[in-house]
Amino acid sequence: MRVPESWLREFVDLDWDIEQIAERLTFSGTSVEDILRPFNVSGEIITARVIERFDHPASEKLIVCKVDTGKRIYTVITADKTVNEGDYVILALEGATLNNGLKIEPREFKGVISEGMLCSLEELGLEEKSDRVYRFPDPVELGVNVVEEYGLNERVLDIEITPNRPDCLSIIGVARELSALSGRPLNKPQPDVSFVDEDVQFDVEIEDVEGCPRYSARIMKGVTVKDSPLWMKARLVAAGVRSLNNVVDATNYVMIELGHPVHAFDLNRLKNKRIVVKSAKGGERVLLLDEKEYELKGGEVLITDGENVLALGGIMGGMESGVYDDTRDLVLEVAYFDPVRIRKAAKALGISSESSYRFERGVDPNDVELVSLRLAELIQKLAGGYVLRKFWDVYPRKIEPKKVMLRKARIEKILGTKVEEPGDILRRLEFQVEDRGDSYEVLVPTFRPDVEREIDLIEEIGRIYGYEKVESKVISVPAVNRGWGEKQLFRREISQFMKGMGFDEVVTFSFVDSQKVKKWPLVDREPIALSNPIASDMDVMRTSQFYSLIQVLAENFKRQNRDLKLFEIGKIYFKENGNFREIETLSAMSCGLENPGDYTDKRSVSFYTIKGVLDELFFRLGVNVVYRAAEIPGLFPTRSARIYVENREIGFIGMVDPKLLDEYDVKEDTYFFEIDMELLRKYASKRPAYRPTPRFPAVRRDISFLLPKGFESVKIIELFKKSGGDLVEEVGVFDIYEGKGIPENMVSVTLYVVFRHPERTLTDEEVNKIFEEMVQKAEREFGIRRRF
């Protein structure tokens, strides 16, 4: 999220400079990654008027202009022959620097000296490409410094907004944080709109209330679609959005300012003069504003006029009903869409927009009228026209603020310090707080969907109060013996680890289908048949937990839950030498998105995702393992491995065979591992000693190799660890690519190597030397070559 400083200060009046603002935000949990200057312009760049224009005496491609700045007249040469007398332009004078780094100085063009330069928007950093001198649409005061007047000296906070804080995807949201931190009041918008009473044939209907709990529309007439003024262009570009026209720019401006995406339709392109919100059935095709046609999967929220699709709700508008130069009448949409439905639709169609980015995380369902008024006010200011008084607002089931009780004693117990007036901190964040004696009754505003429990409120108090103010104390915790044995404690430790890695624990039946075990024998074990099975597909004891987990995964798929991380610690059973045996194993299965809670992260689970979970477990337990490629029935041949400790197999890992997945109607790549808990506990008896935080920085190097498909990258990893010596701290794979630019039957594998010296800082020269030797050794030993 890019937040221009001047825009932020309109909402909260602060004495802090921008560096202090960045520091306070970061300390409170809103991380400022950088302070940017989006425009690389400086010096005397001023408004001027062309008072005379004539052809260059020695060049047909140039013209000579006399330009008045209010103080003196300059001679300027330009190649833009559309410049005319009377045009108000932007003049860069000697010493000025343009966005492309060009420094202005007097220059001779075939016998005529140009004393400056007439600027295009590209040269000011306001457009990516422009070959025309910018002309102000209306007269302006001469001699005004454009850099200062229009914010081309703007500084911008580049803020990393976590997925749980959609309220901060707006200027007002960040300003609210600063208001709470500083104690200064938040200046909320107070839209001033002139209304006209006029009857109009129009209606709004919601058929899909689940996908669209609230939809509002407002009508404007008589607008003029044209280029946006310079101040609007500059502010949008500073915020990372390109300018299109005054109406579209107004919608983007309001979205950035208030955090609620909005849309404008051309009223006269609505066939039935009505809005009907419905759910897609699947198979429909729609042409969107990105000029691409999409076939809908079913379940998407559609904005229609009863017959034609106008927009993909919460994601993108349609081409047919968009705003064009001849648009005169508008329908202004401000709605609330279900975050889950928007996320699923955007993912299924492969669309990512500023609108879906916000709706996926959750916008405020109860700021709709304010946002609509602000949009109407801004369009009226930029495009003229008038606003109809009637406001269509369909909101069948109002979403009420959550009520949470907060115990005062609990605040001090959790934070470890007494906070004066914690209720006031919450009020500054716009929570409604009632003092109930020994507790607070708190109404959580609907723009804060992340706050659900008492502990969330305490976190809000702590971060605004300042964790740096909390005195550090040594905590003494007495040992408690719960009577658990070593085995139970180890089992609990592994369970807690898997939950901490984002996996959900399941408990399943030990009875499975003998036909599945026979067809896909992941392990070479003889199953134990049941003499009296409870069902025909539960007639043997499982030889692997795989058969249980795949069933759970398939059931979730039927219910549209496709981002899954499952694990189970349980028994497997088999015959060995005529005897019945049972072994406790840890098994895990994962598919779908790698981080389903992070809507900015579209990566899917891969082999290295689930292997990374195992690697972290082995590291924590101090177990040194070796992965060896293996063909395992039921797993994909080139993406499976057995796991060994001291040449003894303790488990296996791999990608589930797509043919097997088809039998369960699972359409996502799925990964599985199974580890013998008894052997894991045995080899985990020696835990790693405590290692202090490194005093010296690490140095990372990456390398991409072209490898034959099926090549075991673990061989390179082991070679790097061995040849790099004690300076190599970590080696791993972080990217695999095959496709365009990669030869057939080859794959590009990118590895990273982390170097660190315990006693000093490594130089680039010595790291480069060691790294190059390692790479060359890998090339020689394995007959491979680097990609870059």
Curated annotation (Swiss-Prot):
GO terms of molecular function: ATP binding; magnesium ion binding; phenylalanine-tRNA ligase activity; tRNA binding
Subunit structure: Tetramer of two alpha and two beta subunits.
PROSITE patterns, sorted: B5 (PS51483), FDX_ACB (PS51447), TRBD (PS50886)
SUPFAM superfamilies: Anticodon-binding domain of PheRS, Class II aaRS and biotin synthetases, Nucleic acid-binding proteins, PheT/TilS domain, Putative DNA-binding domain
Species of the source: Thermotoga maritima (strain ATCC 43589 / DSM 3109 / JCM 10099 / NBRC 100826 / MSB8)
Names of required cofactors: Mg(2+)
Positions of the tRNA-binding domain: 39-147
Annotated residues for binding of Mg(2+): D450, D456, E459, E460
This enzyme's EC code(s): 6.1.1.20
Coiled-coil residues: none
Catalysed transformations (reactions): tRNA(Phe) + L-phenylalanine + ATP = L-phenylalanyl-tRNA(Phe) + AMP + diphosphate + H(+)
InterPro entries from the UniProt entry: aa-tRNA-synth_II/BPL/LPL, B3/B4_tRNA-bd, DNA-bd_dom_put_sf, Fdx_antiC-bd, Fdx_antiC-bd_sf, NA-bd_OB-fold, Phe-tRNA-ligase_IIc_bsu, Phe-tRNA-ligase_IIc_bsu_bact
Similarity field: Belongs to the phenylalanyl-tRNA synthetase beta subunit family. Type 1 subfamily.
Positions of the B5 domain: 399-472
Name this protein carries in UniProt: Phenylalanine--tRNA ligase beta subunit
Subcellular location: Cytoplasm
Cofactor annotation comment: Binds 2 magnesium ions per tetramer.
Keywords on record: Aminoacyl-tRNA synthetase, ATP-binding, Cytoplasm, Ligase, Magnesium, Metal-binding, Nucleotide-binding, Protein biosynthesis, RNA-binding, tRNA-binding
GO aspect biological process, one term: phenylalanyl-tRNA aminoacylation
Matches recorded under HAMAP family: Phe_tRNA_synth_beta1 (MF_00283)
